[in-house]
């Protein structure tokens, strides 16, 4: 009987990607199968996030629930990974000595051996180091789970914004070799993936080594991924405005696979607050980049992160943020009240903003975004939209569900063979969280671009000969 594995994931899309790789690793090494029932599991893994307030206590509450399972089942292995593990590894060992494995985001590839060591040593094993790109060199081949997939192209961040823990929990920026990224995308395309989401904490800072010792830019990577047959839609997250350069904007002019949607976090609309955050750009510079982008993609939809009530934020600073939201006309926001993260400079900044004002500002910001989002949705009424059909509708299993370029769900009537294909639909109704459409044409009636088959890409990607020397076929 196969062993069972449960992975509980908190946090960003990078954590979701990491969790999928943990599952693949343990399946390849030990035959583990995933379960959603904790009582069935032989291994329980918690992949944590430390971005929000009280992240550590949330971890210990979850571990307390799992402790009761371990008391009934002593051979149960409990592991904690992710950013909280990196920050609080020693504290976890002290407060939760029943935890068997503690690992960081950069050492998840060592998980099978760490579990084995914990069982043979009958004691906890911890590895929260930063071993550069070794993580990617030791991951199993990707397994597609549907028609969309995440592909991590880099790790870490070197910007050190004053509020952010990422450089301390995931390390400095490290990019994967470009051939490795293309090989993974080609493998996914060969398995039926049609849309890839390129991931990184600062994804547009990608500088990937090539087979001949040069460095490939993020713009070059986007064009190469777009050239892989079957990959007809590309997203990426998360971007930094300072790295959103003209060569990336140029890709939007000639790469239809790049979606008409961009998440480019600005955090605040006040230059004074941006300086305190150590964000190396002004509001005017941010708006200038968006203006350039909209010259080549006039209909592009924008989203951003916002931190409300950063220490020292005045009423005028907040109103500057509200003005920027209206000026850019953001469609989506991920907005939070400032949460001091231990070990970051901003955690020591004095803050005299009352809880009442914090909540009022967050509410005002989110209401403005919601108003703009509904207007954007209504503007799609009676327009034709191309969607990627992801599966049955969650509201009605007799219908299908797809996603537009600007990340909106569309439910429509259609047959199951359309799953995994692109279709054009006419938007007939607008709801708060979704749209309704009618089928106009199927993929067979489209002229999607073909450049290079996945197998051709895989043949050209970097390999090693019997002596371990990297070779490349141009």
UniProtKB/Swiss-Prot annotation:
It catalyses: N(6)-dimethylallyladenosine(37) in tRNA + (sulfur carrier)-SH + AH2 + 2 S-adenosyl-L-methionine = 2-methylsulfanyl-N(6)-dimethylallyladenosine(37) in tRNA + (sulfur carrier)-H + 5'-deoxyadenosine + L-methionine + A + S-adenosyl-L-homocysteine + 2 H(+). Residues 3-120 form the MTTase N-terminal domain. Monomer. Its cofactor is [4Fe-4S] cluster. It holds the Pfam family Radical_SAM. Residues 378-441 form the TRAM domain. It comes from Photobacterium profundum (strain SS9). [4Fe-4S] cluster 1 binds at residues 12, 49, 83. It is an enzyme of class 2 (transferase). PROSITE patterns: MTTASE_N (PS51449), MTTASE_RADICAL (PS01278), RADICAL_SAM (PS51918), TRAM (PS50926). The lineage of its organism: Bacteria, Pseudomonadati, Pseudomonadota, Gammaproteobacteria, Vibrionales. Keywords: 4Fe-4S, Cytoplasm, Iron, Iron-sulfur, Metal-binding, S-adenosyl-L-methionine, Transferase, tRNA processing. GO terms for molecular function: 4 iron, 4 sulfur cluster binding; metal ion binding; N6-isopentenyladenosine methylthiotransferase activity. [4Fe-4S] cluster 2 binds at residues 157, 161, 164. This is tRNA-2-methylthio-N(6)-dimethylallyladenosine synthase. InterPro entries: Elp3/MiaA/NifB-like_rSAM (IPR006638), Methylthiotransferase (IPR005839), Methylthiotransferase_CS (IPR020612), Methylthiotransferase_N (IPR013848), Methylthiotransferase_N_sf (IPR038135), MiaB_methiolase (IPR006463), rSAM (IPR007197), rSAM_horseshoe (IPR023404). NCBIfam families: miaB-methiolase, MiaB/RimO family radical SAM methylthiotransferase. Residues 143-375 form the Radical SAM core domain. Catalyzes the methylthiolation of N6-(dimethylallyl)adenosine (i(6)A), leading to the formation of 2-methylthio-N6-(dimethylallyl)adenosine (ms(2)i(6)A) at position 37 in tRNAs that read codons beginning with uridine. Binds 2 [4Fe-4S] clusters. One cluster is coordinated with 3 cysteines and an exchangeable S-adenosyl-L-methionine. It is found in: Cytoplasm. Its EC number is 2.8.4.3. CDD domains: Radical_SAM. Belongs to the methylthiotransferase family. MiaB subfamily. Transmembrane segments: none annotated. GO terms for cellular component: cytosol. The gene is miaB.
């Amino acid at each position: 009987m196969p062993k069972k594995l449960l992975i509980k994931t908190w946090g960003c899309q990078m954590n979701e990607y990491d969790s999928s790789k943990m599952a693949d690793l343990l399946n390849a090494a030990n035959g583990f199968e995933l379960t959603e029932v904790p009582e069935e599991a032989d291994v329980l893994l918690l992949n944590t996030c430390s971005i929000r307030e009280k992240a550590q206590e949330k971890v210990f509450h979850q571990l307390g629930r799992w402790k009761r399972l371990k008391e009934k089942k002593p051979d149960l292995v409990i592991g904690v990974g992710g950013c909280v593990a990196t920050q609080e590894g020693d504290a976890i060992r002290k407060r939760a000595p029943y935890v068997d494995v503690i690992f960081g985001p950069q050492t998840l590839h060592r998980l099978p051996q760490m579990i084995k060591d914990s069982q043979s040593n009958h004691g906890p094993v911890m590895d929260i180091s930063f071993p550069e790109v070794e993580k990617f060199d030791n991951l199993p081949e990707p397994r597609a789970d549907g028609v969309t997939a995440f592909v991590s192209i880099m790790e870490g961040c070197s910007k050190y914004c004053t509020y952010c823990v990422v450089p301390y929990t995931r390390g400095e920026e490290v990019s994967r070799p470009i051939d490795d990224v293309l090989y993974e995308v080609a493998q996914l395309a060969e398995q039926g993936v049609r849309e890839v989401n390129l991931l990184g904490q600062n994804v547009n800072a990608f500088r990937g080594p090539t087979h001949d010792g040069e460095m490939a830019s993020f713009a070059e990577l986007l064009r190469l991924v777009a050239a892989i047959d079957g990959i007809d839609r590309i997203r990426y997250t998360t971007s930094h405005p300072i790295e959103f350069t003209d060569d990336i904007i140029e890709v939007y002019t000639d790469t239809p696979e790049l979606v008409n949607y961009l998440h480019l976090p600005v955090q605040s609309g006040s230059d004074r607050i941006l300086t305190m955050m150590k964000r190396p750009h002004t509001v005017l510079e941010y708006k200038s980049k968006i203006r350039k982008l909209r010259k080549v993609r006039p209909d592009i939809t924008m989203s951003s992160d916002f931190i409300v009530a950063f220490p020292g934020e005045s009423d005028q600073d907040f109103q500057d943020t509200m003005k920027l939201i209206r000026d850019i006309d953001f469609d989506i926001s991920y907005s939070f009240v400032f949460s001091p993260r231990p070990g970051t400079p901003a955690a020591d900044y004095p803050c005299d903003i009352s809880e009442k004002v914090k909540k009022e500002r967050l509410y005002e910001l989110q209401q403005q975004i919601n108003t703009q989002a509904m207007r954007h949705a209504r503007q799609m009424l009676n327009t034709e939209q191309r969607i990627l059909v992801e599966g049955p509708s969650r509201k009605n299993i007799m219908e299908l569900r797809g996603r537009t370029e600007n990340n909106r769900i569309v439910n429509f009537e259609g047959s199951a063979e359309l799953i995994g294909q692109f279709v054009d639909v006419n938007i007939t109704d607008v709801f708060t969280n979704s749209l309704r459409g009618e089928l106009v044409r199927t993929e067979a009636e489209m002229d999607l671009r073909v450049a290079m088959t996945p197998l051709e890409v895989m043949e050209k990607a970097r390999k090693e000969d019997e002596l371990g020397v990297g070779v490349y076929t141009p």
